[in-house]
């Protein structure tokens, strides 16, 4: 819970502007509103003002675009859900302060912003009937398989030869498989549906007519697998009508998790014609440049 509140704190910061001039002076303009100096106040303004201006702008635009979709009651319910995870109010307040959040009122604001961003992601995560049907078809068939995983192809070929000559699959798996999770069970992976294993593994495991057969070595990112499919079946009482809502929700959550918040911010800035009036803030609003710099940093770290 502390980690959750600490992550929330990143959105919560409200800084005091040390620069001179009126607090009503706009630093960002957009259709139907503005962000002024009072929105980004703090003594740390000189260092963090640009980033705070960006965050305040995005908060206001999220509110403008999605505010009607998040009610006060929903926010209050989320706050209560969080508070209920603490033994008492004192510990809750202490954790808030540790996370840099002054009080419960401020926490409500932070939580509301997160809920607005979630709404924005959901708007970009529509699920089609075909996607639901495809996932249903994936899930209704499950197979049971065992495998032996080794690092080198030469070792996999030698093991396959042993098996072709009558070697015991379970005994060899226990002795030689590097997948410690299944090796102790003779390589048994149990039943699984499509989407649970890597693609190369599934391409063999879900092929028709492979039950009881032993595959040639199959290469994946983990090494070389020798697979034995021992059963294949369709789930009982598993209908599209019963599973549709669950699948739709799961797909929407998966899609939402893949949405880049910067894509949301770009579309909002374009829609509301955001103009950065303060030249010191321009880089904070240049998301393409920031993403480019992050990629360069990641490449440099990988090379080290």
From Swiss-Prot:
Family classification: Belongs to the PrsA family.
InterPro entries: Foldase_PrsA, PPIase_dom_sf, PPIase_PpiC, PrsA_foldase, Trigger_fact/SurA_dom_sf
Gene Ontology biological-process annotations: protein folding
Gene3D superfamilies, per database record: 3.10.50.40
Alphabetical keyword list: Cell membrane, Isomerase, Lipoprotein, Membrane, Palmitate, Rotamase, Signal
Catalyzed chemical reaction(s): [protein]-peptidylproline (omega=180) = [protein]-peptidylproline (omega=0)
Localization (cell): Cell membrane
Enzyme class: isomerase
Main location: membrane
Domain PpiC: 140-231
Any coiled-coil regions, as ranges: none
Signal sequence segment: 1-19
Membrane topology of this protein: Lipid-anchor
Name this protein carries in UniProt: Foldase protein PrsA
GO molecular function terms attached to this record: peptidyl-prolyl cis-trans isomerase activity
Entry GO CC: plasma membrane
Organism expressing this protein natively: Exiguobacterium sibiricum (strain DSM 17290 / CCUG 55495 / CIP 109462 / JCM 13490 / 255-15)
Lipidation positions, renumbered (S-diacylglycerol cysteine): 20
């Amino acid at each position: 819970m502390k980690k959750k509140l600490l992550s929330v704190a990143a959105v919560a910061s409200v800084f005091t502007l040390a620069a001179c001039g009126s607090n009503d002076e706009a630093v960002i303009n957009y259709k139907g509103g503005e962000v002024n100096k009072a929105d980004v106040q703090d003594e740390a303004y000189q260092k963090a003002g640009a980033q705070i201006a960006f965050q305040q702008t995005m908060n206001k635009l999220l509110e403008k675009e999605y505010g009607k979709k998040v009610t006060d009651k929903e926010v209050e319910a989320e706050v209560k859900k969080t508070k209920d995870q603490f033994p008492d109010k004192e510990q809750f307040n202490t954790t808030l302060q540790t996370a840099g959040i002054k009080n419960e009122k401020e926490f409500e604001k932070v939580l509301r912003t997160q809920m607005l961003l979630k709404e924005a992601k959901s708007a970009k995560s529509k699920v089609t009937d075909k996607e639901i049907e495809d996932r249903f078809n994936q899930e209704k068939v499950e197979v049971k398989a065992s495998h032996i995983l080794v690092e080198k192809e030469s070792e996999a070929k030698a093991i396959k030869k042993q098996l072709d000559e009558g070697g015991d699959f379970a005994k060899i798996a226990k002795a030689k498989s590097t997948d410690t999770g299944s090796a102790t069970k003779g390589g048994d992976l149990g039943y699984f549906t499509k989407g649970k294993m890597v693609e190369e593994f599934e391409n063999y495991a879900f092929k028709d007519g492979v039950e009881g057969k032993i595959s040639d070595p199959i290469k994946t990112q983990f090494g070389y697998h020798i697979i034995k499919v021992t059963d294949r079946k369709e789930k009982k009482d598993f209908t599209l009508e019963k599973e549709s809502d669950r699948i739709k929700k799961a797909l929407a959550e998966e899609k939402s998790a893949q949405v880049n918040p910067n894509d949301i911010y770009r579309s909002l800035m374009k829609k509301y014609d955001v103009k950065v009036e303060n030249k010191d803030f321009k880089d904070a609003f240049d998301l393409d440049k920031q993403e480019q710099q992050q990629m360069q940093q990641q490449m440099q770290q990988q090379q080290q």
